[in-house]
Amino acid sequence: MPIQEDLQAFLAEWHDPSPFLEVQTSGSTGTPKRMRVRKDRMLNSARLTCDYLGLKKGDKALLCMPLRYIAGKMMVVRSLYAGLDLKVREPSGHPLADWGDTPLRFAAMIPLQVYNTLRVPEERKRLEQTDILIIGGGAIDAALEQEIRQMPNTVYSTYGMTETLSHVALRRLNGPEAVSYTH
């Protein structure tokens, strides 16, 4: 299903009067499972992230991940909570290809999207102009982390899962507040 259709379906479920909605685990530790989660807890997670990152009404945010998983759903919930201007792209390995000159305040990507984006000069420039980038959904290898350290914007690695309604930890990857992690 194209992402715009997924988005409309998610918004319909979000605005439904039920205090719950269904999400699907990624299956990274076994068979993917469906589970019901409370919308108010999703809003609380969105509030914590938006407040911590200083996101506010009108900031441009990028949705470039599938809405069948919690990461994509939480980008929408953060946008609803904070009044972000959500830009929607079909999930792909190159989310900033043919993007144009619209600067982004906030984006969330998986490591492969970041890796691919950094390989294409025009896409790399757009990524470096994105004020805040969070990277989740998988480990960031040492070579990619080293490349990210050189980026001028604010980049975090996230740790979380469906059961925690997105990330529960952020680790700064670059800038003076960067936190090194050795394996």
Language-model features: where?
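Short beta-strand->loop structural element characteristic of the AMP-binding/adenylate-forming
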Residues: M1-E5, K33-R36, D85-P91
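Conserved pre-ATP/AMP-binding loop-to-beta segment of ANL
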Residues: D6-Q24, K57-K60
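Conserved small/polar residues in nucleotide/adenosyl-binding loops
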Residues: T25, T182-H183
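AMP-binding/adenylate-forming
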Residues: K39-N44, K60-N116
